[in-house]
């Protein structure tokens, strides 16, 4: 395997150029979940009629390039943003998301995947799902195939669950595929994807995003919630009902461009969410949120499953700088502000180099 990797490096295109071969570039946004997260896990939404999730697509997200290279002998060559390379075989599908998605959509392998941008693991911004979307779109493009969005999301959800060995939802895939802001409504008939007419610039002006530097494992946090609800925990049931109400309020407030209403809904979502499991709101996360609120934020929450990762604040535009400074001061060493550019629709797949 090591010899084959060296041979692939010698013959495959470098990062700076791609002479003689078409290089397909795909960009997939990340997301900030404002309200209703966790409800996208089946069958949790079946227990809570009216369940919906409201999120915003943001960049920078995942950016990768894919080159077909039959000299790889049916393997997948993966290069991470830090330059580390791995050769993947079909047998790796159960432990590696690149292999799971890549070999599903291109069973014959023979591709070089050069990941240019990707969030750190545990960001809470749906990075693994955005990566899966980007890779699937690239593979489908080179194959000349189309898959309906709902079918693609269902497939990627199942592939990701197989790698994580944990329940997975759908809310992270949709912003990566369709942009935002979105309201995802869940019913026995499926998922209804509603694109909200709220201007993306209005949203970006009111969002602050901080990488807390605190590691978390979304799959395990979600499993705690999943198990507690299925086992009939009254605390978890009440919290999820409150999250349903908060998400409905958030959608309505976004459609009305009601700054305070959105803040109240996001705050209500976090107040309920932090009671779902002990791991959702560790003291370091609570300290950052409290500091942001004291500095003038209307609401703050840990993104995704919580427990660490990224902390989002909803705030009047004029207080963004003060909230950022306060949250960083209260954060552990290594925390940093993340840029927030909201995304209406992801860019199309493009050919960036060809002969």
Annotate each PLM feature.
Residues 1-33, 39-42, 47, 55-58, ...:
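C-terminal nucleotide
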Residues 125, 301-302:
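A phosphate-binding catalytic loop at a beta-strand-loop-alpha-helix junction
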Residues 125-149, 177:
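DPxDG-like acidic metal-binding loop motif
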Residues 121-123:
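Helix-loop-helix module between adjacent transmembrane segments
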Residues 308-310:
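Glycine-rich active-site/cofactor-binding loop and its immediate structural neighborhood
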Residues 110-112:
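Residues at or immediately flanking beta-strands
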């Amino acid at each position: 395997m090591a010899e084959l990797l060296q041979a692939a490096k010698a013959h495959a295109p470098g990062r700076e150029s791609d002479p003689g071969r078409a290089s397909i570039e795909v960009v997939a946004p990340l997301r900030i979940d404002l309200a209703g997260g966790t409800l996208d896990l089946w069958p949790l939404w079946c227990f809570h009629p009216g369940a919906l999730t409201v999120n915003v697509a943001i960049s920078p997200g995942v950016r990768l390039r894919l080159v077909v290279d039959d000299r790889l002998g049916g393997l997948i060559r993966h290069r991470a943003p830090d330059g580390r390379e791995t050769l993947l075989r079909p047998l790796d599908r159960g432990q590696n998301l690149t292999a799971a998605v890549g070999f599903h959509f291109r069973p014959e392998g023979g591709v070089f995947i050069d990941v240019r941008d990707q969030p750190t693991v545990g960001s809470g911004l749906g990075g693994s799902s955005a990566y899966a979307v980007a890779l699937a779109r690239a593979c489908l493009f080179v194959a000349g195939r189309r898959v309906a969005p709902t079918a693609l999301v269902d497939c990627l959800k199942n592939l990701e669950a197989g790698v994580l060995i944990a329940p997975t939802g759908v809310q992270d895939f949709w912003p990566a595929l369709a942009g935002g802001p979105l309201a995802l409504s869940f019913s026995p008939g499926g998922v209804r994807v509603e694109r909200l007419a709220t201007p993306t610039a209005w949203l970006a002006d009111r969002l602050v995003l901080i990488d807390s530097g605190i590691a978390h494992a979304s799959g395990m946090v979600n499993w705690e919630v999943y198990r507690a609800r299925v086992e009939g925990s009254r605390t978890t049931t009440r919290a999820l009902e409150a999250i349903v109400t908060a998400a409905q309020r958030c959608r309505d407030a976004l459609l009305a461009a009601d700054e305070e209403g959105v803040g109240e809904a996001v705050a209500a979502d976090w107040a309920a969410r932090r009671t779902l499991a002990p791991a959702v709101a560790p003291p370091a996360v609570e300290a950052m949120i409290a500091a942001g609120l004291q500095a003038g934020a209307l609401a703050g929450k840990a993104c995704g499953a919580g427990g660490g990762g990224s902390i989002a604040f909803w705030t009047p535009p004029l207080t963004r700088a003060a909230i950022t400074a306060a949250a960083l001061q209260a954060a552990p060493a290594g925390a940093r502000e993340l840029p927030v550019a909201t995304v209406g629709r992801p860019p199309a797949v493009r050919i960036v180099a060809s002969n």
